[in-house]
A protein has these predicted regions:
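N-terminal leader/targeting and assembly helices and adjacent pre-domain segments
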Residues: 1-199, 289-294
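Acidic, glycine-rich two-metal-ion catalytic cores of nucleic acid-processing enzymes
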Residues: 201-294
Length: 294
């Protein structure tokens, strides 16, 4: 499941980079001279051709009717900014690519979390023989808006910062005159960690958003499963729980496990008391319990 989610996130990153690359190259081919393209050349009034590029970029967003308010608000803002001058229009086009990628990641994460939550709720329902009313209480956690509120807000904050960083990289090169080689360098991605330079490569900076989306999926999936489990345990009268480390768990989680069992209302939370990407779990504390099902 992680591989499928990761592949989708990688696809969104590639689409965002291709979108930005296509439009930057179009502006370069339109306005560059023998010395490249400079900030002076883009600090001009928006032309008819520029507006055509903007309309094309907007059309590439597709149907935005089901986009979240966070995305629609940002689209409105960048629409106003785009009309200031050519430089701001370029910034706004970059923002559009990032916004679309963030919407895709948000939908991908939401779908994955709901799937994981429902799977865990079904597992708990079967194992503990929950009544229909009890099952509804458990599944209500999955659809609670508060479940997605915090991580989605953080996703958009990170998205805004990343868009700003990419815009900064482009504008820094424009200040000194951007050659075609400079443009290619900005857009070059590096799979080798030793070559990874998010402070110099827009592609590498955008890739950081992909890594962030992966972290959110793993972290929030673990949080949701933990909440589903703990609500179920309380309903079934469980008084103590054991912390069960995932294979290859870190020293922190091993220490948490060794300090168990914990009272149901005093047990460490996943991931708040462990760490992002934690895949440990908690099970009812029963002497000589066979843990294989959990």
């Amino acid at each position: 499941m992680d591989d499928q989610t990761d592949q989708q996130s990688s696809q969104y990153t590639a689409e965002c980079l291709a979108f930005i690359q296509t439009h930057l190259m179009a502006f370069y081919e339109r306005y560059a001279d023998d010395e490249g393209i400079s900030l002076t050349q883009v600090k001009q009034r928006v032309s008819k051709w520029d507006m055509g590029q903007w309309k094309q970029a907007i059309s590439q967003m597709g149907d935005v009717s089901d986009w979240p308010d966070d995305a629609k608000q940002r689209m409105t803002i960048v629409g106003f900014i785009a009309g200031i001058d050519r430089s701001h229009l370029l910034d706004s086009i970059i923002s559009l690519g990032v916004i679309k990628m963030t919407v895709s990641n948000q939908k991908n994460i939401t779908h994955r979390l709901q799937l994981d939550g429902k799977t865990e709720a079904r597992r708990m329902g079967d194992f503990f023989d929950l009544t229909s009313k009890q099952s509804k209480k458990v599944t209500s956690i999955i659809t609670d808006p508060e479940t997605t509120k915090i991580w989605s807000q953080n996703l958009w904050v990170d998205s805004d910062k990343m868009a700003g960083d990419v815009q900064y990289l482009v504008n820094q090169h424009l200040k000194h005159g951007m050659s075609l080689n400079d443009l290619n360098d900005i857009l070059a991605s590096h799979a080798n960690p030793k070559q990874f330079k998010p402070g110099q490569s827009a592609a590498d900076r955008i890739s950081q958003m992909e890594f962030n989306a992966r972290r959110i999926v793993r972290t929030e999936s673990a949080r949701l499963k933990d909440e589903v489990n703990m609500v179920t345990y309380r309903m079934k009268g469980v008084t103590k729980v054991d912390w069960v480390c995932e294979p290859g768990a870190c020293l922190k989680c091993q220490g948490i496990e060794e300090l168990g069992p914990y009272p149901i209302n005093g047990a460490p939370d996943i991931p708040d008391d462990s760490h992002p990407n934690c895949r440990c779990s908690k099970i009812p504390h029963i002497e000589n319990l066979n843990r294989s099902y959990f």
